[in-house]
C-alpha cells in the first residue's frame, strides 16, 4: 500500500496533529487504544496509508512528533491520545527555540535533527512503498518554522523522489503571538518554495474570521481554530485514505494541482462549517455545498478571491450523493464564473466523491484551490518583514545564532519573485475579457508564451 509518514513539529504542529489523529481515528473506527471498532470494511481497506498494524491488531499512527521543548509532548502523552502513539515517536529537546527561526534551523534544531531523522528512517523502513511525507507546522514560531524547514531539507536529501507536502499555518497580525513572526514566516516560505511539492496554507486570520462570522463564536480558542484545521486536513486526505477515484495519491494530487513548480501554495476550504461539538440540523444539497465551498468566507486563507484567478482546483465531496449532480454543479460554477478560472488550462477543476462522510455530517465538501490571490498573504507578510528589516530590528537575535544576514535579503527577494510570478499568470491573456475572438487568441497563445 502507498504509505504516508506524518510529521508534526512545534507547539502548533503538535496540537493540530493531535486533532488530526483524533479525527481520522474516528473516521476509520480506530479507538484511542488503537483497536479496530469500525462498522465497515471500507474503513480498514486503506488503513495502512496512515497506520502501522502492530501485534494483536493494534493500529499505530505512522507519526513522528517533534518539539524543542517537552511541554506540548507531555500534554499529548498524558491526553486521551497518549497511548495511541509509539513511545519512540516522540522526539523533543529541552531548551525551546524562543520563537527564533535561526535557533530552530541552525543551532538547537540542528542538534536534535539526527535523532528525528532516525525515527523518520525507522518509520519509512516499515513501509512497503512509501509515497511521501506530510509535515504539520506553523511558520510564525521558531521550532515549526526553523526546524520544520530544516527537517524538510534533510528528508529531501535522503528521499529525493518522494513527495513532500506541508500543512503550514501562516501568521497574521490580528492573531500575533510575537513581533518577529514576519521574519520567521518569510525565512520559512523561502525554504518551502524550494523544498515542498505542495503546501496547504492555513491562515490564522481566516480561521478567526470563520469563528466570528460564520460560527458566531465570541471568544474563539486555539481549540476552535484547530478543529477547523483538522476538518480541512481530514477532507484533503480523504481520497488518500478511502478507496476513491481521483488524486488517490500525493503525486497525482501534485500533478493535477501544480502547473509551474514554484506555484504550489494552495488555499483549502471546507463546507459546511460547524463549530466543535455542534450538530448539523439539516443536510445541505450538493448545490449548497458547491456554492459554500467556492465562497471566500469558507476559505482557510485570508485573501480576496475576486481579485485572483484559479489556475487549478480539486474538490472532494463526501457522503451519499449523485456523482452526476456533483459534475453538473461544478460545471455550472465554471460557466457562471468563467473569468475566475484561467482559460489557458482547460478542465482545471477536478472532483472526487467518497461515500463515507465525516463524523457527525451527512455530506461535506473540501476544496483545494491554486489561486493567484494567495500572493496577498505573501505580500502581507513580506511588507511587515521589510518594514522591520529596513531598520535591522531584532536581527541580532538571528545573527547571534550564526545566521548570515544575507539570508534575510535572499528570502525577501525570493518572495517578491513568487508574488510577481503569481501576478504574471493572473494577468496572462487578460485581454480575453474584452475580446470576443477567443478561438483566435487561443491559437495564437503558444507563440505569445515564447518570450
UniProtKB/Swiss-Prot annotation:
Gene Ontology biological process: microtubule cytoskeleton organization; microtubule polymerization; mitotic cell cycle; platelet aggregation; platelet formation; spindle assembly; thyroid gland development; thyroid hormone transport
Membrane-spanning ranges: none
Record key words, sorted: Cytoplasm, Cytoskeleton, Disease variant, GTP-binding, Isopeptide bond, Magnesium, Metal-binding, Microtubule, Nucleotide-binding, Phosphoprotein
Name of a matching Pfam family: Tubulin
Post-translational modification remark: Some glutamate residues at the C-terminus are polyglutamylated, resulting in polyglutamate chains on the gamma-carboxyl group. Polyglutamylation plays a key role in microtubule severing by spastin (SPAST). SPAST preferentially recognizes and acts on microtubules decorated with short polyglutamate tails: severing activity by SPAST increases as the number of glutamates per tubulin rises from one to eight, but decreases beyond this glutamylation threshold. Glutamylation is also involved in cilia motility.
Binding residues for Mg(2+): 69
Assembly: Dimer of alpha and beta chains. A typical microtubule is a hollow water-filled tube with an outer diameter of 25 nm and an inner diameter of 15 nM. Alpha-beta heterodimers associate head-to-tail to form protofilaments running lengthwise along the microtubule wall with the beta-tubulin subunit facing the microtubule plus end conferring a structural polarity. Microtubules usually have 13 protofilaments but different protofilament numbers can be found in some organisms and specialized cells. Interacts with RANBP10.
Protein name: Tubulin beta-1 chain
Gene: TUBB1
Amino acid at each position: 500500500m502507498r504509505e504516508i509518514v506524518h510529521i508534526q513539529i512545534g507547539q502548533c504542529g503538535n496540537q493540530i496533529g493531535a486533532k488530526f489523529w483524533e479525527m481520522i481515528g474516528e473516521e476509520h473506527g480506530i479507538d484511542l487504544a488503537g483497536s479496530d471498532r469500525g462498522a465497515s470494511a471500507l474503513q480498514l481497506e486503506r488503513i495502512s496509508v496512515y497506520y502501522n498494524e502492530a501485534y494483536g491488531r493494534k493500529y499505530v499512527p505512522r507519526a513522528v512528533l517533534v518539539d524543542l521543548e517537552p511541554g506540548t509532548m507531555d500534554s499529548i502523552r498524558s491526553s486521551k491520545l497518549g497511548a495511541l502513539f509509539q513511545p519512540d515517536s516522540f522526539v523533543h529537546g529541552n531548551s525551546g527555540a524562543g520563537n527564533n527561526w535561526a535557533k530552530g534551523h541552525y543551532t538547537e534544531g540542528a542538534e536534535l535533527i539526527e535523532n528525528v531523522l532516525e525515527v523518520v528512517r525507522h518509520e519509512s523502513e516499515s513501509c512497503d512503498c512509501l509515497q511521501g511525507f506530510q509535515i504539520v507546522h506553523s511558520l510564525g514560531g521558531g521550532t515549526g518554522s526553523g526546524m520544520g524547514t530544516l527537517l524538510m531539507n534533510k528528508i529531501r536529501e535522503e528521499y529525493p523522489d518522494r513527495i513532500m507536502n506541508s500543512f503550514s499555518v501562516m501568521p497574521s497580525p490580528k492573531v500575533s503571538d510575537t513581533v518577529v513572526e514576519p521574519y520567521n514566516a518569510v525565512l520559512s516560505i523561502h525554504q518551502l518554495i524550494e523544498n515542498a511539492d505542495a503546501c496547504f496554507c492555513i491562515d490564522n486570520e481566516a480561521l478567526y474570521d470563520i469563528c466570528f462570522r460564520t460560527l458566531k463564536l465570541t471568544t474563539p480558542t486555539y481549540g476552535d481554530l484547530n478543529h477547523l484545521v483538522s476538518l480541512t486536513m481530514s477532507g484533503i486526505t480523504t481520497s488518500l485514505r478511502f478507496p476513491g477515484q481521483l488524486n488517490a495519491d500525493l503525486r497525482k494530487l501534485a500533478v493535477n494541482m501544480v502547473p509551474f513548480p514554484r506555484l504550489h501554495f494552495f488555499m483549502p476550504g471546507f463546507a459546511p462549517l460547524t463549530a466543535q461539538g455542534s450538530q448539523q440540523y439539516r443536510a445541505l444539497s450538493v448545490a449548497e455545498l458547491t456554492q459554500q465551498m467556492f465562497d471566500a468566507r469558507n476559505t482557510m486563507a485570508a485573501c480576496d478571491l475576486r481579485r485572483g484567478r484559479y489556475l487549478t482546483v480539486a474538490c472532494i465531496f463526501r457522503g451519499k450523493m449523485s456523482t452526476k449532480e456533483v459534475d453538473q454543479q461544478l460545471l455550472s460554477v465554471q460557466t457562471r464564473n468563467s473569468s475566475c478560472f484561467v482559460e489557458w488550462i482547460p478542465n482545471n477543476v477536478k472532483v472526487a466523491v467518497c461515500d463515507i462522510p465525516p463524523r457527525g455530517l451527512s455530506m461535506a465538501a473540501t476544496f483545494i484551490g491554486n489561486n493567484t490571490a494567495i500572493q496577498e498573504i505573501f505580500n502581507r507578510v513580506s511588507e511587515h518583514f521589510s518594514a522591520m528589516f529596513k531598520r535591522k530590528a531584532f536581527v541580532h537575535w538571528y545573527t547571534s545564532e550564526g545566521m548570515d544576514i544575507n539570508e534575510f535579503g535572499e528570502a525577501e527577494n525570493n518572495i517578491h519573485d513568487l508574488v510577481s510570478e503569481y501576478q504574471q499568470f493572473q494577468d496572462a491573456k487578460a485581454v480575453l475579457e474584452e475580446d470576443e475572438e477567443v478561438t483566435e487568441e487561443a491559437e495564437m497563445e503558444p507563440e505569445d508564451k515564447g518570450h
